[in-house]
A protein has these predicted regions:
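Long amphipathic alpha-helical segments used for membrane anchoring, targeting, substrate engagement
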Residues: 1-10
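Intrinsically disordered, low-complexity, positively biased terminal segments
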Residues: 9, 20-37, 48-50, 181-389
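Active-site rim helix/loop that mediates acceptor-substrate recognition in acyltransferases
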Residues: 43, 50-97, 206-229, 321-324
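Conserved beta-strand in the GNAT
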Residues: 77-79, 85-95, 108, 113, ...
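Conserved acetyl-CoA-binding loop-helix of GNAT-fold acetyltransferases
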Residues: 109-133, 262-273
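Conserved GNAT acetyl-CoA-binding A-motif
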Residues: 128, 133-147, 277-287
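Conserved active-site alpha-helix within GNAT-family acetyltransferase domains
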Residues: 137-141, 147-165, 267, 289-305
Length: 389
């Protein structure tokens, strides 16, 4: 999707061509690592990232390219080319996500962009369609993305599946210290302790992404060198949570805090509150249903709830075969018409049967159905973000 921003392409002036000439020369194909600089330049243009902004966090253009190179080699990147110039692109990272205790192959959609002079030509729709077909071939039954335009992705079949809560806590509102059996240890941000803590958390958390080296590389990309981490270990010396943070201008910034239980949550907030004399407030984001204000003695903190990830079922039949429905004393059946604006394999009339044990099966049917649902609603419902009324 094209975004009209500042003139030029990261210092490069785009050649002015007519729309008809563009169409004649355009070709969709995989984007190899030899196009890494063009790939990065297009992202920089679309998201309006300047050299000054990169330098402010200690990054240089070449460092970004080197950091992105291993990720791009493993990703499925496709784009439109005008002769040999990359003008529109999407990237899909091979990932895994935990969905109600099951591990699903997931496609992480990112790197989406089109130069403005090539917008309104249907290029991105065709790229997304091909990317989804590739995901289906790779067995990736669901796709996650972090949207810059919720309405646009809704039209293509994605829907909100999680929220982000941004909060501000004044120093005098920090929770009081409470005794816990474990302890908090500061660790190397690139060490195995942090990964072990996250793996324990992700395996038991619905919707969490299982991070391999590729995912960790993306997670850290763009962070400053000042970022730090601390892990909470329980009395059995098992990592039950962590906080990733940095301190600047008397503000304790929390990039991420995860915990498996109340003990770990308390221990990590004890650690944050121990910085009381160094800071004026704490700012951070949380991506869970944690009732943060409720858990504080002074609950009058600032919280802003905003959409976070969007998700999309890629292959409905395959997704249902793996999905753990709740057991019941009765077999269940639902007949409905499913609508998908992009994937033909998901369009049509279906019968969903669920056994008493919670195993689902979907078959196509020819008979007309009174109920109708689109893939967006089906996704957010099965992901547990919204329940049917």
């Amino acid at each position: 999707m094209g975004l009209v921003g500042k003139k030029g392409c990261c210092g490069q002036q785009r050649k002015g061509k007519g729309i008809m000439n563009n169409k004649k020369n355009l070709k969709m194909k995989p984007v190899g690592s030899e196009y890494m600089e063009q790939y990065n330049a297009l992202l920089r243009y679309v998201f309006q990232v300047t050299e000054q902004e990169l330098s402010s966090i200690g990054w240089q253009e070449r460092e970004i390219i080197r950091a992105k190179f291993p990720t791009m080699e493993k990703a499925d990147v496709i784009g439109w080319f005008d002769d040999d110039n990359l003008v529109s692109q999407v990237a899909v990272y091979p990932m895994q996500a935990r969905i109600f205790g099951r591990t699903y192959a997931m496609g992480g959609l990112t790197g989406v962009g089109t130069y403005p002079e090539y917008s309104n030509m249907g290029l991105m729709h065709k790229l997304l369609e091909q990317a989804l077909k590739n995901m289906k071939e790779h067995g990736q039954d669901i796709c996650y993305l972090y949207p810059y335009s919720i309405p646009y992705y809704r039209r293509k079949g994605w829907e909100i599946i999680s929220d982000k809560i941004s909060y501000e806590i004044k120093d005098y509102q920090l929770p009081k210290n409470h005794q816990v059996p474990g302890d908090v240890r500061r660790v190397d941000t690139e060490g195995e302790e942090l990964k072990a803590a996250y793996n324990r958390y992700a395996m038991r958390t619905h919707g969490a992404i299982l991070r391999d080296d590729l995912a960790w590389n993306e997670y850290w990309l763009g962070d400053s060198d000042d970022i730090m981490a601390a892990v909470y270990y329980n009395e059995n010396n098992e990592p039950d949570g962590y906080v990733i943070y940095w301190i600047a201008k008397e503000v304790f910034h929390i990039k991420d805090m995860i915990f498996n239980n109340e003990e770990a949550r308390t221990g990590l907030w004890n650690f944050v509150a121990a910085h009381f004399s160094m800071i004026n407030q704490v700012e951070g984001d949380t991506y869970t249903d944690e009732p943060l204000a409720f858990l504080l003695e002074d609950a009058s903190i600032k919280e802003i709830i905003s959409p976070y990830y969007m998700g999309r079922i890629v292959d409905f039949v395959s997704f249902i075969e793996k999905y753990p429905f709740k057991p019941s004393v009765l077999d269940r059946e639902w007949k409905f018409k499913l609508i998908d604006p992009v994937m033909e394999c998901n369009q049509g009339n279906f019968s969903l049967t669920i056994s008493r044990e919670g195993c689902g099966q979907v078959v196509r049917i020819m008979e007309p159905c009174q109920d109708e649902i689109n893939i967006q609603t089906m996704t957010t419902m099965l992901m547990g973000y919204k329940r049917p009324e």
